[in-house]
């Protein structure tokens, strides 16, 4: 069964790249065409790469690995936190702190401090202190919670990272590559594919696109966790809310993809030839 369908990708605007004057030439092979000065991503390739990334994430988690979800841009913050939390994985959706991976021993000490402050607050450890001291400790706790709350239970560097917008998260990507940690990421038309091990060509600026692809990765994690626990496979297809009707040209793309897929796999739910 298809992990995600061409229709879902189109509904989410995953096929829209950047303006033609803002692009990385290395992305040329992932571009289907351009329309009104906007690059249109080849969603047929997107589907293929989604399957590869999905399988990698599923197998990584099934064998005891963890995936760190990273997306600090406004459009990704909510879905990154929600999907990572849904499958019990660590996440960073606020500012990436330099050294979060390459200097994890120091970060781990800050996590211990966060837990210490939380325990103090919950067990009355703030009692007997001056208002100024309590205020200082509370501010310290809140600051740590804001920057490290998503990785509070991460005891070691992750097995892989999922990234929304590799340009914005270039520090995270650089640290992962330095440590040999596989990078799975959305590749918009202004990104560098050489920095990513498991690319998914797509729109990393639209909220719906980032949410859909993040949900796909989280579903792969969920399936990996099921395999690890010896539970049967569930339906990995992510649910998507109803979308705006497709434009006529987008309907043509979908029809073209479906028509091409039909002879190959009759009745297969996954379209096979779509531009974007």
Curated annotation (Swiss-Prot):
Keywords: Ribonucleoprotein, Ribosomal protein. The keyword Cell membrane does not apply. GO terms for molecular function: structural constituent of ribosome. It comes from the Bacteria. Residues 255-276 are annotated as: Disordered. GO terms for biological process: translation. Pfam families: Ribosomal_S2 (PF00318). GO terms for cellular component: cytosolic small ribosomal subunit. CDD domains: RPS2 (cd01425). Gene3D superfamilies: Glucose-6-phosphate isomerase like protein, domain 1, Helix hairpin bin. PROSITE patterns: RIBOSOMAL_S2_1 (PS00962). Belongs to the universal ribosomal protein uS2 family. HAMAP family: Ribosomal_uS2_B. This is Small ribosomal subunit protein uS2. It comes from Mycolicibacterium paratuberculosis (strain ATCC BAA-968 / K-10) (Mycobacterium paratuberculosis). The lineage of its organism: Bacteria, Bacillati, Actinomycetota, Actinomycetes, Mycobacteriales. The gene is rpsB.
């Amino acid at each position: 069964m298809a992990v995600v369908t061409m229709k879902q990708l189109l509904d989410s605007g995953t096929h829209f790249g950047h303006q033609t004057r803002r692009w990385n030439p290395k992305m040329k092979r992932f571009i289907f065409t351009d329309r009104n000065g906007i690059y249109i991503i080849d969603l047929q390739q997107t589907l293929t790469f989604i399957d590869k990334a999905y399988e990698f994430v599923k197998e990584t988690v099934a064998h005891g690995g963890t995936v760190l979800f990273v997306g600090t841009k406004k459009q990704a913050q909510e879905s990154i936190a929600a999907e990572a939390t849904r499958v019990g994985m660590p996440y960073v959706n606020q500012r990436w702190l330099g050294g979060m991976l390459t200097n994890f021993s120091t970060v781990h000490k800050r996590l211990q401090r966060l837990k210490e402050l939380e325990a103090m607050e919950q067990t009355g450890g703030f009692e007997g202190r001056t208002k100024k001291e309590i205020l200082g400790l509370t501010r310290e706790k809140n600051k740590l919670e804001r920057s490290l709350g998503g990785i509070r239970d991460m005891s070691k560097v992750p097995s892989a990272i999922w990234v929304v917008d590799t340009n914005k998260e270039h520090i995270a990507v650089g640290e992962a590559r330095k440590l040999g940690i596989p990078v799975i990421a959305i590749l918009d038309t202004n990104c560098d594919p050489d920095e990513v091990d498991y690319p998914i060509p797509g729109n990393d600026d639209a909220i719906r696109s980032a949410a859909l692809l993040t949900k796909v990765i989280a579903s792969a994690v969920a399936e990996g966790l099921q395999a690890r626990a010896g539970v049967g496979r569930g339906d990995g297809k992510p649910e998507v809310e109803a979308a705006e009707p497709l434009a006529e040209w987008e309907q043509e793309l979908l029809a073209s993809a479906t028509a091409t897929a039909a002879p190959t796999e009759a009745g297969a739910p996954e379209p096979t030839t779509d531009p974007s």
